[in-house]
Amino acid sequence: MRKYAYLKNPQKCNDKEYIYKIMLHTHKEGVYLYEYCSLDAIICSYDQLYFDVSDIYEDWNSEIDERGWIDIDDPLPEN
């Protein structure tokens, strides 16, 4: 499963960069959260590994905009 979301307000991640959108990706190792420092970025700037998707929702649901989580297809089958 993959879902992405845009943040209501950019989140500062260091002295120069802000996170504008995020994507979650469930994997056999856990759930990856990819963080993008540009609205049109296709390659993430940062990532985090969570044990459960509910932890991502708990951390991020209040930060995403009114469009909510948007489902997208997995580009490749998981090995």
For the regions a language model picked out, list residue spans one by one.
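Negatively charged, low-complexity tracts enriched in Asp/Glu with abundant Ser/Thr
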Residues: M1-K16, P75
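Short, low-complexity, intrinsically disordered N-terminal segments
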Residues: K12-L24, I56
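Low-complexity, intrinsically disordered short peptide segments enriched in small/polar/basic residues
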Residues: K16-I19, K28, Y50, N61
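Short aromatic-glycine-(Arg/Gly/Cys) micro-motifs in beta-strand/loop hairpins
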Residues: I19-C44
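Mixed-charge, Lys/Arg-enriched low-complexity segments
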Residues: L39-N79
